[in-house]
Amino acid sequence: MKIYFTRTILLASHLNNDFLKIINEFKEPENKENLLILFKKHLESIAFDKYNSLIQEVLEIESKKYNLKNKMEEILKIKSLEKFLNWHREIILSLDFAELSNIKFIQNNLIHLSQSNWEIALDEYWNASIVLNNLSKPPKQHYFLFQQTGHYDSILETNVVEYKLSKYEYFLLQQFYKPKELIIVIKDFIDVFEVQSSVEYNALYSEIRHMLKIMIFNKLIIPQHNRIIQI
């Protein structure tokens, strides 16, 4: 359980010493489907006063990640699909951008966009003090995503990874909730900004192209006909 709800436990224990005692005595159920229910019940038994909304938001996000993890047979299917997408991605990225921009892309349905009032997403450099410091800051909009992958992390016991996103990456990805040509997305995205000169336009255009290529490389957006229907 401590693996799945690291941030919630860390924050709750920091705010209330009684919670740490409860967690240390917690016995995980054999049925993992009941784990989240029991964990929430234990969390609700402790008062966090003005921090309740923060605790609930962190728990909600970690619960989402927990519920996204796949069974081993599903992970193997994703792995097989990733091999195909990797092969096709190399072909796509070798195209001239003028040709690439006319292809319809859509969000990979294995990614799940999220936002929070605190910087919750973890990276490989995280530690307890960083997490607690981030959660002590005033609320501010932060963006990230969860991605179901074909790799099972035996230490974290999940195949779900998380990535921090900039505001622009988040809103750019949102444009692909339905199939769209890159050229249309670029135009719509640039129209949001009040571009004053050709220099500003070219700089913005170049940055959007760069973000889109990274999204394609990371399989966050994929050609419409490659959309994974079901796992």
Task: Give the predicted meaning of each segment.
Residues 101-103, 135, 155, 211:
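Homeobox/homeodomain signature
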Residues 109-176:
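Low-complexity, glycine/alanine/valine/leucine- and proline-rich hydrophobic stretches
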Residues 1-96, 161-231:
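Long, charge-rich, low-complexity alpha-helical segments
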Residues 97-105, 111-113:
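Aromatic/basic-lined ligand-recognition segments
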